[in-house]
Amino acid sequence: MEIYHQYIKLRKQFGRFPKFGDEGSEMLADIRPNEDHGKEYIPRNPVTTVTQCVPEMSEHEANTNAVILVNKAMSHVEGGWPKDVDYTEAEHTIRYRKKVEKDEDYIRTVVQLGSSVEDLIKQNNAVDIYQEYFTNVTMDHTSEAPHVKTVTVFKDPNNIKRSASYVNWHPDGSVPKVVVAYSILQFQQQPAGMPLSSYIWDVNNPNTPEYEMVPTSQICCAKFNLKDNNLVGAGQYNGQLAYFDVRKGNGPVEATPIDISHRDPIYDFAWLQSKTGTECMTVSTDGNVLWWDLRKMNECVENMPLKEKNSETTVGGVCLEYDTNAGPTNFMVGTEQGQIFSCNRKAKNPVDRVKYVLSGHHGPIYGLRRNPFNSKYFLSIGDWTARVWVEDTAVKTPILTTKYHPTYLTGGTWSPSRPGVFFTIKMDGAMDVWDLYYKHNEPTLTVQVSDLALTAFAVQESGGTVAVGTSDGCTSVLQLSTGLSEASPAEKANINAMFERETTREKNLEKAIKEAKVKARKEQGRRDEVKDNVTEEQLKALEDEFFKTTDPAVGGGYGAGEGAAAE
């Protein structure tokens, strides 16, 4: 039965907006059940039916083609010269130019094009397109939420996956290259047939490495040379220091002799400030700091054991900090025991090369960096915390300490573009961005980079891009938001004032603790004076007198009287 409703509207009302209103209910149809049809109904018995109790799901797959980037170039040196003209000879080219300039077609074409080109030049000169309407404009990023964006990911091309143990950016900030050292540092956990290669990657071509370093032992740390960027220094697992030249094949150019090298893996090294740029220093868990020169690798320039003053026990070094702003001979070493050694290479007395030792961490220190805007303050990362220290012999405690994280910290560093920002990476695969300019008690941003442990970290010179290595060999390149990479005008002064305030607070606390200890000693002295002071001689005299009184052989006492009565 078809149900329809007729709506009539005049032609003149077409195009007007309708105005609807509420009306009462109206019955349009009333269909009663048919009893004859009901009598013909027969129930089916048995009934076969199928029921699906789980949610319906379908499988979808997508296979995207990887974008493979290849750099190609063509050198066209001949130019547009004819074959009979030698472009290397100036006389031939001048003679040919004069010949062409006398051609009638050339003259007519230049005259025709000259008028149109002249109009375009006048239009370009009419308006100064390079005029700056607003100068010294400061960007306000306070309203922008901090965030990061993944630029690319470098994956270890080998089947046996190794950890990205060290990451270092190219010293030239305009060159987007990263050297990544791959290794398995766990003792006796290296599988058979494990590759030893480490790679230099180009951010613009993440599919294939730009250069492969093939060492004699797996590389634990690698850094670009600061003066000659074609050289890459590498600290190896067997304790040797080698350097590679990207222009001279994949093997090391030269390496230190095994008998005078470290006895443990080289966990960190630094290029020193020198005229040639070939001097460097290495640190290892064997307890020694060694200095080398690439021009003479067959011998060690200098050796320094890591031990405190008036102590014969050496401690193993894990990380190294060298900053020319703090002095070309000053450096710091983070140890396995959680101590920070502040050293001076050129001390007059060899015993005084270790200036002082700071303690505070409960485990190895994996990160140690000075603030790039004020080298007096430095950051240490170890156990479950990150701590900010001041290089002052009067302050032996950190001026700032982060909260204890539920997982272990594995690295981090300061931001090179903002004085109050530093980064930490953790074993749970998260990266924390701390902004001391806004808050101290918790990180400004936490990014879950991977489900696996983060093992290496480095920041580009511009401060806007970071590289994070994981335990499965992946290296993620992340781009920070402008609020995390660009400093505000008064940030440096405010951060320095905050550090000075915290330093003064620590000094006042230490002064109060010393005064409390002196007061406690005085109270203890007063209590000792109240007690009965008996000397050792007086105690000896009282003891002898007691034994004489109670001894029977002397003739006195209870035993002597009893014997006389028996007689």
From Swiss-Prot:
Ranges of the WD repeats in the UniProt entry: 214-254, 261-302, 360-399, 404-444
Cellular location(s): Cytoplasm, Cytoskeleton, Flagellum axoneme
GO cellular component: cytoplasm; dynein complex; microtubule; motile cilium
Disulphides: none
Tagged with keyword Repeat: yes
Major site of localization recorded for this protein: cytoplasm
Gene Ontology biological process terms in this record: cilium movement involved in cell motility; outer dynein arm assembly
UniProtKB keywords: Cell projection, Cilium, Cytoplasm, Cytoskeleton, Dynein, Flagellum, Microtubule, Motor protein, Repeat, WD repeat
Assembly and binders: Consists of at least 3 heavy chains (alpha, beta and gamma), 2 intermediate chains and 8 light chains.
Role noted for this protein: May play a role in regulating dynein heavy chain (DHC) activity. May function in holding IC78 to the DHC, or in stabilizing the entire dynein complex.
Family label: Belongs to the dynein intermediate chain family.
PANTHER family reported in the protein's UniProt record: DYNEIN AXONEMAL INTERMEDIATE CHAIN 2, DYNEIN INTERMEDIATE CHAIN
Name used for this protein in its record: Dynein, 70 kDa intermediate chain, flagellar outer arm
Species assigned in the record: Chlamydomonas reinhardtii (Chlamydomonas smithii)
Gene behind this protein: ODA6
